[in-house]
From Swiss-Prot:
One of its GO terms (molecular function) is serine-tRNA ligase activity. It comes from Coxiella burnetii (strain CbuK_Q154) (Coxiella burnetii (strain Q154)). Pfam families: Seryl_tRNA_N, tRNA-synt_2b. The gene is serS. It is found in: Cytoplasm. Its EC number is 6.1.1.11. This is Serine--tRNA ligase. Homodimer. The tRNA molecule binds across the dimer. Catalyzes the attachment of serine to tRNA(Ser). Is also able to aminoacylate tRNA(Sec) with serine, to form the misacylated tRNA L-seryl-tRNA(Sec), which will be further converted into selenocysteinyl-tRNA(Sec). The lineage of its organism: Bacteria, Pseudomonadati, Pseudomonadota, Gammaproteobacteria, Legionellales. Keywords: Aminoacyl-tRNA synthetase, ATP-binding, Cytoplasm, Ligase, Nucleotide-binding, Protein biosynthesis. Disulfide bonds: none annotated. GO terms for cellular component: cytoplasm.
Length: 423
């Protein structure tokens, strides 16, 4: 959520920055709501002032032995009118809050202009795509051996965009997740956290999936108002809800492996085959809560930490800076990591690392105590995929495939795979 002070004091600037990301803010509606809010506030203050004055007059009348009943009746009438005005104010505040919740974050000044992923800027590449003396196969074909990648079984259980992994592929999937967790906890200093996979609706509001992306969420039937997590970012960031963290305890660095559940409502016809776009997939998520002045340095750090996974697995990739029009709803700046897939002869997204500044923190009131002032201030929240496990498995399968269809085990993964060289 944007700072209401910025909206009130520098509305034109906000409108222009939002226009960079293709969002047209209805400034007329904002001004109407703001005027109604001010009018309701003034009315409430006026009623309260009159009531206080009458209360004093009643006290004076009683002290003089005068009949206070007419004045008390007037106070009662004022109280009724005050309650009505307070209810009106709450209605206006709700409309104002709903209006704010629909506004995305402002892009950072360094974010390049652009309308879509076609305008994203490549920052760097690492590694060279492998050369094959045979035509490289798609991961779905490679997975047919011993039926280790079984989409038919998954369809029988759950329908399209699910997968059943068996044997060596299931083990490789588990090994990759464990390798990522070990790297981030042992070398990058993250605290591992196990979190619920069902969260309250307010958690999704807190991180920005709601209200805009409701159709992309899986909501659990019943009266508990649970949602399946679309990313580990949701429970991790919400751990700081309504917390005030002391400065020496910062930064908070949390990592979790969770399943992610997404309806892919806007992805009809995209990546219908294989494991690239699924309703359920595993992801290792990195989250940091930091002091505001450190957040852009931290964004570079998280990006490098996600890159380290790909480097240790010797998977060629590139880093792309998202243009303003391709930013996620809550992000002020984002880097995507895209891994090379030989069968597609192109790079595909495998990680997204974002600085949300105080956008999420304002929604969940995640704060730190500034030792200089002694007062609580909003934190900056950052998140990054470290990495998407299924897509990493796809990249390993395709980049390490052999002519006979077997997959060579990356050196970094051998100890997690029982020391075997191929699977």
């Amino acid at each position: 959520m944007l700072d209401p002070k910025i909206l009130r004091q520098n509305l034109e600037h906000v409108v222009e920055k939002l226009r960079r990301r293709g969002f047209e803010m209805d400034s007329d509606t904002f001004l109407q709501l703001e005027n109604k809010r001010k009018e309701a506030q003034l009315a409430i203050q006026s009623f309260q002032t009159k009531r206080n004055q009458l209360s004093k007059t009643i006290g004076m009348a009683k002290s003089k032995g005068e009949n206070p009943e007419p004045l008390m009746a007037e106070v009662s009438q004022l109280n009724d009118e005050l309650k009505q005005e307070e209810a009106n104010f709450e209605t206006i505040q709700k409309a104002f809050s709903d209006f704010q919740l629909a506004i995305p974050n402002l892009p950072h000044d360094s974010v390049p202009d652009g309308k879509s992923e076609n305008d994203n800027r490549e920052i760097r590449q690492w590694g060279a795509p492998p050369g094959f003396d045979f035509t490289p196969k798609d991961h779905t074909v490679l997975g047919e051996r011993d039926n280790q990648l079984d989409f038919e079984a998954a369809a029988k259980l759950s329908g399209a965009r699910f997968v059943v992994l068996r044997g060596s592929l299931a083990r490789a999937h588990r090994a990759l997740a464990q390798f990522m967790l070990d790297l981030h906890t042992d070398q990058h200093g993250y605290e591992e956290v196990y979190v619920p996979y069902l969260v309250h609706e307010e958690c999704l509001y807190g991180t920005g999936q709601l209200p805009k992306f409701r159709e992309e969420q899986f909501q659990v039937a019943g009266d508990r108002n649970f949602f399946l997590v679309p990313t580990g970012e949701v429970p991790l960031v919400n751990l700081a809800r309504d917390e005030i963290i002391e400065a020496p305890a910062l930064p908070k660095k949390w990592v979790a492996q969770t399943p992610c559940f997404r309806s892919e409502a806007g992805s009809y016809g995209k990546d219908v085959r294989g494991m690239i776009r699924q309703h359920q997939f595993q992801k290792v998520e990195l989250v940091q809560l930091v002091q505001p002045e450190n957040s852009y340095q931290t964004l570079e750090e998280i990006t490098r930490q996600a890159e380290k996974v790909l480097q240790l697995l010797a998977l060629p990739y590139r880093v792309v800076e998202l243009c303003a029009g391709d930013l996620g709803f809550a992000a002020a700046k984002t880097y995507d990591l895209e891994v090379w897939l030989p069968s597609q002869n192109k790079y595909r997204e495998i990680s997204s690392c974002s600085n949300c500044e105080d956008f999420q923190a304002r929604r969940i009131q995640a704060r730190w105590r500034n030792p200089k002032t002694g007062k609580p201030e909003l934190l900056h929240t950052l998140n990054g995929s470290g990495l998407a496990v299924g897509r990493t498995l796809v990249a390993v399968m395709e980049n390490y495939q052999q002519a006979d269809g077997h997959i060579r085990v990356p050196d970094a993964l051998k100890s997690y795979m029982g020391g075997v060289d191929y699977f």
